[in-house]
């Protein structure tokens, strides 16, 4: 009997040791950052399926709910086809947002081995963090800890991109703030916008932003603010509908500044076709159809017929289907179901 019990403990001990080693590989091995992120991604998808099922019911399988869901599929398609050049808030679109870390000590504790073994809010050292309430560049958690930066920190489960972006960051595309920052000379040529493209040396920067906007006084800059509001209203973004309705008068003023005072129509069509326009057509800028048309063929006469910079014609070349382009578009615009809170 004693021998049998001893053998049992040996087997149990061996099983426990193997379990420990397997768990250690999962949380600290060479591929641990990817593994832990995949676990979080699966959990996120499960929560999304639950939300969609409660609202719409299940026609066939739970996973079928995700096939037509822009929030999940749009992000995946973006990561697969767009993130080699573009970013989405500095990552590939598939980052999992984690609980903020209020202090450096908290971030260090959450990234430790013990936390990764047992805690649900653990952070891998290879994931990314940055100061909260900023649009600063993401750094690896390890780099933040080594630099002893003061918190609080936003933290995401995502790997740091190997290469610098070669096209604009599309988080918030066509929102008021995104457009207003686009009209800032320094931001226009930054990596967040066109710093990695040939457009940084184009007429938009050289003849307008650098030559004119840098000399604008307060009144001129106020007109640019109104133009950003008016141009963003062209997108008809779902998350901005109430603000656009409330700011109808400001939008009308912005349209006037765009067409008259600032003279955007010297280079862009707006409201009606202009065969002599050098820049993209601003009519419906950022709207669902505008984005779809652009992704299908950026070299169309409405966009960049002569100076497209490496953007593939995803529709013309059949790289993406119409449905896939629509999913990416709706995801970028935030046009998808969200449960009421």
Walk through the language-model features, giving the residues of each.
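N-terminal export/targeting leaders of redox proteins
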Residues: 1-65, 143-152, 157, 215-231, ...
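C-terminal substrate/ligand-recognition segments
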Residues: 2-29, 70-71, 75-86, 176, ...
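The canonical Cys-X-X-Cys-His
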Residues: 74, 78-89, 107, 124, ...
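Gly/Gly-Pro-rich "capping" loops immediately C-terminal to redox-active cysteine motifs
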Residues: 87-116, 126-129, 156-184, 190-212, ...
């Amino acid at each position: 009997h004693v021998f049998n019990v001893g053998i049992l403990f040996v087997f149990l001990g061996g099983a426990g040791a193997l379990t420990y080693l397997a768990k250690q590989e999962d949380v600290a091995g060479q591929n641990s950052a990817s593994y832990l992120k995949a676990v979080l991604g699966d959990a996120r998808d499960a929560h999304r399926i639950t939300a969609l099922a409660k609202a719409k019911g299940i026609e066939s399988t739970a996973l079928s709910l995700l096939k037509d869901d822009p929030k999940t599929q749009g992000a995946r398609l973006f990561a697969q086809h767009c993130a080699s050049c573009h970013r989405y808030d500095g990552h590939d679109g598939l980052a999992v947002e984690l609980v903020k870390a209020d202090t450096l000590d908290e971030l260090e504790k959450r990234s430790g081995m013990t936390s990764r073994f047992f805690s649900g809010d653990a952070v891998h050292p290879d994931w990314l963090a940055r100061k909260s309430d900023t649009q600063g560049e993401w750094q690896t958690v390890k780099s933040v800890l080594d630099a002893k930066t003061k918190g609080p920190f936003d933290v995401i489960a995502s790997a740091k991109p190997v290469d610098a972006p070669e096209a604009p960051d599309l988080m918030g595309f066509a929102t008021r703030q995104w457009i207003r920052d686009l009209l800032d000379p320094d931001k226009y040529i930054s990596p967040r916008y066109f710093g990695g493209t040939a457009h940084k040396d184009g007429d938009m920067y050289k003849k307008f932003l650098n030559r004119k906007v840098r000399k604008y006084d307060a009144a001129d800059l106020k007109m640019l603010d109104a133009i950003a509001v008016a141009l963003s209203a062209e997108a008809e973004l779902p998350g901005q509908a109430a603000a656009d309705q409330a700011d109808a008068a400001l939008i009308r003023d912005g349209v006037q500044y765009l067409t008259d005072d600032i003279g955007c129509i010297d280079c862009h069509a707006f409201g009606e076709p202009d065969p002599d326009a050098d820049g993209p057509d601003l009519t419906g800028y950022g709207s669902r159809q505008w984005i779809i048309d652009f992704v299908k063929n950026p070299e169309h006469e409405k966009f960049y017929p002569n100076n497209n910079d490496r953007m593939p014609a995803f529709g013309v070349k059949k790289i993406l289907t119409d449905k896939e382009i629509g999913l990416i578009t709706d995801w970028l615009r935030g046009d998808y179901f969200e449960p009421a809170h």
